Amino acid sequence: FETLASYGEVQQEKVDDMREQNKSVHSQQKIALVVDSTCDLPVDILEKHHIHVVPVRLNFGKEQYIDRVTISNEEFYSKLANSAHHPQTSQPPPADFRRMYQFLSSHYESVISLHLPKVLSGTYQNASAALEKVTFKEHQVILDSLSVSAGTGVIALELAEAIDQNMSFAELTQLADETVEKTEIFI
């Protein structure tokens, strides 16, 4: 998008991960797990467990990026060290969540969507508003992680491993509640 911006003004950015979509089509899992990109898990773990990520927006002054899509972690830390602007984030728009849920609803029976605490960000609310407009065959739930970064990552990994073990949706939501309750992170 940076290259295109030099030729004019980018009005809107839309990015789809075709590799991830292909994996979803061929997945044997019945329950999808969705997180936002503040969930601090390495890409190899996200891919291994088919964890679907809706990216947050990052702003350095007037420059806007889509986390992990139009800016890598390395580029982010380089900008952090060299930019005169302190980065700011904004939650993914409801349309990003809706697009993700619509795609997943055609390949999975249920979805668990785990996000930043609703008291810290509008991410949870945007995910919830989007999910109200999409129907899965079985179940759908939005979970407040009550945590950030690595804390959300721990919860997501616990759920992903349980999904891999074919736990039922009811067992997964109970596990989520227990894991959220016992997960603490110090900043």
How should each PLM-predicted stretch be described?
Residues 94-103, 127-130:
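Short, charged beta->alpha transition segments
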